[in-house]
Amino acid sequence: MEQNEFGLIEKIVYLNRVAKVVKGGRRFSFSALVVVGDGKGSVGFGLGKAQEVPEALRKATERAKKSMIEVPLIDGTLPYEILGRFGAGHVLLKPASKGTGIIAGGAVRAVMEAVGVTDVLTKAIGTNNPHNVLRATVAGLASLRSAEEVGQLRGKKLEAPRK
């Protein structure tokens, strides 16, 4: 977990060396998948490709900063259960009680830590490809709505929950 000068958390999810076969042999380049978040409900991801690793990381970070979304959080967890989908990847995101921690692997864990979630249960279904899992996670988080937003859409006033 790395913080930059703007207080953003940057996480490298996946770094890949790819080869293009040309007449003289193989040409190598790199692709980097990076997640950026502020730890307070904002998160974004980016994919960068270049001939050198640092340049690929820089491009990925720039794209991640441009694709930031807001996520409504309640006491360090999600407001309700959601299923994010992208391609063959499905990611189930469930709110968890205090002290549970982040029960997630790989790409999902990076997103949850960057967005500022402290307690969550997750399950990646259908694929283990980091690109698709990451996009499914972000799609799920992007579709979350706060109680105020839902009330506004329905034209209802928000009341205190019944016990």
From Swiss-Prot:
Keyword list, A-Z:
Ribonucleoprotein, Ribosomal protein, RNA-binding, rRNA-binding
The Swiss-Prot or TrEMBL record annotates one GO molecular function as:
rRNA binding
SUPFAM superfamilies listed in its UniProt record: dsRNA-binding domain-like, Ribosomal protein S5 domain 2-like
Instruction: Say yes or no: keyword Coiled coil present.
Output: no
> Highest taxon of the source?
Bacteria
Instruction: Report the residue ranges that make up the S5 DRBM domain in this protein.
Output: 8-71
- One short Pfam name that applies is Ribosomal_S5_C
The entry's cellular-component GO terms read: small ribosomal subunit
Report whether Ribonucleoprotein shows up as a keyword of the record: yes
**Quick one: a GO biological-process term for this protein?**
translation
Oligomeric state and interaction partners are given as: Part of the 30S ribosomal subunit. Contacts proteins S4 and S8.
- What's its job? With S4 and S12 plays an important role in translational accuracy.
Q: What is known of its domains?
A: The N-terminal domain interacts with the head of the 30S subunit; the C-terminal domain interacts with the body and contacts protein S4. The interaction surface between S4 and S5 is involved in control of translational fidelity.
**NCBIfam families reported in the protein's UniProt record:** rpsE_bact (TIGR01021)
Q: Would you identify the family this protein belongs to, as annotated? A: Belongs to the universal ribosomal protein uS5 family.
Protein name (Swiss-Prot/TrEMBL): Small ribosomal subunit protein uS5
The species is Nitratidesulfovibrio vulgaris (strain ATCC 29579 / DSM 644 / CCUG 34227 / NCIMB 8303 / VKM B-1760 / Hildenborough) (Desulfovibrio vulgaris)
